[in-house]
Amino acid sequence: LEVHDGGRKNNVLHVTEVMARPASSGPEWIEISNPNHFAVALKGWSLNHTSGSTSTNLLMQSGVLSGQSLSLLTGDPSSQVVGNATHVVDLGSKGFLGVGQLDGLDNNQGVLSLRYTQLDETTPSDVARIQWGGGTELFLITGESLVWDGSDRFDESAWAIQDDPTPGDYDG
């Protein structure tokens, strides 16, 4: 598998759906789309979750997302519904996403950022940002997810509550 343009400044991955309040003791999950025709190496990519004064970071150090693929980052791969996802990545073992009563993402309010750090730099740049609860109008109840409408990756109005989550089935 060749990875092209892995170090360029305008890498694009899209966070397309987020499950922060799973039902029936299910796993939290983040759906990521690679819309490019080339694979993207995960080295240099990171996730950040902030809620109140608490912040959690996860730097990905290996892995590749194939071109035009859909990936699920999950708190528990064994209980995750995967739909048409090409890749399923366990972030529960890394302590970033939870399952059941163990929360990685705050149920009530939070900010989730997908970030990329250039190989010669130390500071990551946000590639996408999702916010719920707090000052937003996005208040989740158990079993609802947040889904991206395909527009601005930083605008909270680009996100809506989904009553029937669709892990691994983004068609944008």
Listing of model-derived features with the role each one plays in the protein:
Residues L1-G172:
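Intrinsically disordered, low-complexity linkers and terminal tails enriched in Ser/Thr/Pro/Gly
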